[in-house]
Amino acid sequence: MAVASQRRTIQFAIALGACCALSALGFLGAQSAPPRETARVSDRRIVRTVPDRLPQMLPPARAAGSWPSFRGSEASGVAEGQNLPDKWNVRRGENILWRTTIPGLAHSSPVIWGDLLFVTSAVSSNPAATFRPGLYGDGDASDDRTRQRWMVYALDKRTGKILWERVAYEGQPIDKRHIKSTYASATPATDGRIVVAWFGSQGVFAYDVNGNLRWKVDLGRIDVGAYDIPSFEWGPASSPIIWNDLVILQCDTQADSFVIALNVQSGETVWKTPREELPSWGTPTVVTTSAGAMLVTNASNFIRGYDPQTGRELWKLGGSSKITAPTPVFKDGLFVIASGRQPEGPIFVVRQNAKGDVTLAAGKTNSEAIAWSRIARGPYMPTPLIYRGLVYVLNNNGIFDAYNLGTGEEVYRQRLPNIGSGFSASPVGADGKIYLSSEDGEISVISAGTKFTQISTNDMGETLMATPALSEGVLYARTAKNVFAIGRKK
């Protein structure tokens, strides 16, 4: 492979907030009914373990302030009615409601249901284990192969008190991780009765909200890394989502890629759809369209739309980057799906009625199915934000763009000041403001609208890789060592 090609490949530094899976432990348990499978998958093992039978749980009503998975409901990143402060000061405690130290390393984001906040972490037996933030081209794996404890924590979101913590898995990592990543980069998901954590090749683990293990599933090895240099193991970051009674996971690996839906209460496979894909890091999205529910995944060979009930492919779109990380988002009948690796680096805006192969013809930027597109403008890590009629695109190098959602017209392009180590966390929006979190730990508050206006910059004092969560007037920021609750003191 040419040196230039290798250099372009290793520029990927997986650090999503994010964001995958269980190792061979001789797990027991049989499925009560065969899963639907759209095509034969090779020998990948899927093994389910269920502890002593626990009662079935009815799905709760959506609790106030819920932020159930990566970037909240439908990955929108938006929560209105928050009345958040524009400024806070960690050192002086101004507008800091609480902070709680979480051991270990993780880029996973907090998720919230009611008064419960869940986070994950991987705690190394080597207290010096770390990761390296920043804008650089190294594609090396970390030398941290020490014994880990993969943890799930439940906190009281009002006080920050740790209510329970569980060791989901303990052992030496099956795969390596990128020097910028952690062994817990996938964000958990919850529906108010179950919280699901995915730890790559270590497994998928489901607890009830009281900390009882409900089930765990071995999906086999989740080998995610450079598509053209297999020895570059970077680790997963795609996060689980819960839709109705399904836990949906996107498993794009060096071989045998697939999307799978598990029963949320039992872990049984409901459907599994194989696909020819390169490794990817984006989280899938399920939204309600005019034609019903649709599951959309971002990946290298094709961006795809599926029926989330069955896993049947509805449409596909070629032309994406060889490395994909941002999550699809949806608003006003339009999907925004993007990726930043050059030379493609596209932003695609797909109409909700897309069917079949909707790949654009050479030289075309729109079609019946594609409202508009742009090449070499996509973000590398952060997921775009659709907010109040505009699409905001934050790249890891600090370039911040705004486009008209309906037309694709560029509203502005702004280089953020003092970008430092760059950006991995995705923007979130509330009450006409946008919150941008840098790897150096600065959260900038930007006015939403057609003119770029920076209101404030707030230093968290720590590296920040995870996307914040918003709930009932509080911004929850997960830094390298702590979870912070930021809000107006009453």
Regions found by a protein language model. Name each.
Residues A2-G17, L22-K490:
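Noncatalytic, solvent-exposed loop/strand surfaces
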